[in-house]
Amino acid sequence: MAASAWLEAGLARVLFYPTLLYTVFRGRVGGPAHRDWYHRIDHTVLLGALPLRSMTRRLVLDENVRGVITMNEEYETRFLCNTSKEWKNVGVEQLRLSTVDMTGVPTLANLHRGVQFALKYQSLGQCVYVHCKAGRSRSATMVAAYLIQVHNWSPEEAIEAIAKIRSHISIRPSQLEILKEFHKEIAARAAKN
């Protein structure tokens, strides 16, 4: 790993709890500063912040979540979220696609894996909770890829659709670039068929 990547990963670890506390604060405060913990994007996908253990019952029973796409690194979910085994015990499959917080970009392969995972649950009439720490960047990138595939939208159209529902998403330029690559691959496959 290059020195800059080590620094970025280290910075993400140092800032994890302070930024998580900020996310919790924004979820609990009233008025214009309030941010909902998660939002339903369509009949299959919910986009949100860390699915805390206390939310499990609501996600499974009220939202019909049977799949969880975790864009976090393992250390981010170690103490506050269900383990893969705990998810399995309540009938939920977890797919972990580890991506560094703040500076990370999901790989093209992971975007494809995540979209196929969501489509599997879509075909079963069940829901998928896609998350990172705050539900703003890494997970929003994954949800944009899902919308690109499902609706044949451009990356910009997908991001705009998400932002209309969850206005505080933040797709960085490097994440937009990977979405453009994803879109190009999806369009090329569609042209072959």
Swiss-Prot record:
InterPro entries registered for this protein in UniProt: Dual-sp_phosphatase_cat-dom (IPR000340), Prot-tyrosine_phosphatase-like (IPR029021), PTPMT1 (IPR042165), PTPMT1-like (IPR044596), Tyr_Pase_AS (IPR016130), Tyr_Pase_dom (IPR000387), TYR_PHOSPHATASE_DUAL_dom (IPR020422)
Active site: residue positions: 132
Subcellular location: Mitochondrion inner membrane
Tissues expressing this chain: Expressed in liver and in pancreatic beta cells.
Domain Tyrosine-protein phosphatase, residue spans: 37-188
Enzyme Commission numbers on file: 3.1.3.27, 3.1.3.16, 3.1.3.48
Disulfide-bonded cysteines: none
Protein name (Swiss-Prot/TrEMBL): Phosphatidylglycerophosphatase and protein-tyrosine phosphatase 1
Record GO cellular component, one term: mitochondrial inner membrane
Function: Lipid phosphatase which dephosphorylates phosphatidylglycerophosphate (PGP) to phosphatidylglycerol (PG). PGP is an essential intermediate in the biosynthetic pathway of cardiolipin, a mitochondrial-specific phospholipid regulating the membrane integrity and activities of the organelle. Has also been shown to display phosphatase activity toward phosphoprotein substrates, specifically mediates dephosphorylation of mitochondrial proteins, thereby playing an essential role in ATP production.
Assembly behavior: Interacts with STYXL1; the interaction inhibits PTPMT1 catalytic activity.
Catalytic activity annotation: O-phospho-L-tyrosyl-[protein] + H2O = L-tyrosyl-[protein] + phosphate; O-phospho-L-seryl-[protein] + H2O = L-seryl-[protein] + phosphate; O-phospho-L-threonyl-[protein] + H2O = L-threonyl-[protein] + phosphate; a 1,2-diacyl-sn-glycero-3-phospho-(1'-sn-glycero-3'-phosphate) + H2O = a 1,2-diacyl-sn-glycero-3-phospho-(1'-sn-glycerol) + phosphate
Residue positions where N6-succinyllysine is found in the record: 85
Principal place of residence: mitochondrion
Other facts: Its absence in pancreatic insulinoma cell line INS-1 832/13 alters the mitochondrial phosphoprotein profile and markedly enhances both ATP production and insulin secretion, suggesting that it may serve as a drug target for the treatment of type II diabetes.
Pathway: Phospholipid metabolism; phosphatidylglycerol biosynthesis; phosphatidylglycerol from CDP-diacylglycerol: step 2/2
Family statement drawn from the similarity comment of this UniProt entry: Belongs to the protein-tyrosine phosphatase family. Non-receptor class dual specificity subfamily.
Primary enzyme class: hydrolase
